[in-house]
Amino acid sequence: MKQIVGLVLILCCTQMVAQEVFPDGKAIPEWFRENKEVNVNALGKKYSITNYGVVNDSTVVQTKKIQEVIDLAAQNGGGVIVVPQGTFLSGSLFFKNNTHLYLEENAVLKGSDDISHFPVKMTRMEGQTLNYFMALVNADGLDGFTISGKGTLNGNGLRYWKSFWLRRSINPDCTNMEEMRPRIIYMSNCKNVQIEGIRIMDSPFWSTHFYKCSFLKLLNLRITSPASPVKAPSTDAVDLDVCNNCLLYTSPSPRD
């Protein structure tokens, strides 16, 4: 009996040890278990975009005004860019050191369906470094950047999808590189990033793309694209490109 109990204890200990390592045998760092929610109150001053001339209007593209709020926060040491309840239309936004994005409940940051509102810059796409349209939310070289809240990043992809399928009907071999369209989130050379709680929907192209990022946490996100009435082409939920130490986790009881 003692031998049986001893064998059970050994097996239990072995199982516990197995749970503490990756499949390649390397130890799992404690970082993967420390999944605390973003505390926006600890991230500095809050800059609600509607306090700086941005209006709740889903028909007016307000890229310039929203970017000015981001730049103002960066110039003053950083802070949290707050998108309040409402729908705000924008092209590419570029976040700076010590700035963060917070989407309140029922807040929607919506991408323009006009590709001209997304500048062409050197970026990464399908394994290549090339000039391509930037995303709705962009971050490069940031340490500690966060996106949090209960709001939505809406890529507003319908017009882009229709254009893709029209081109594909004319040229069945049409590729993504021939029918260019923006992503929702693109981050490069960033570390200690956490994106949590938000909804990401209707991306024109890849929903999120991370290049050369490390210590990246994507927690309790809801990422969706439709299959009908117009199928959303190549709207991958998450694309990890030359990244390391990444955690994608959804709790057993998502919001919806």
Language-model-derived ranges and their functions:
Residues 241:
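Glycine-rich phosphate/ribose-binding loops and adjacent secondary-structure elements
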Residues 2-6, 16-82, 87-100, 104-189, ...:
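Extracellular "leader-to-stem" segments immediately downstream of a signal peptide or signal-anchor
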Residues 237-238:
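Core domains of intracellular innate-immunity/apoptotic signalosomes
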Residues 249-256:
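Conserved small/polar residues in nucleotide/adenosyl-binding loops
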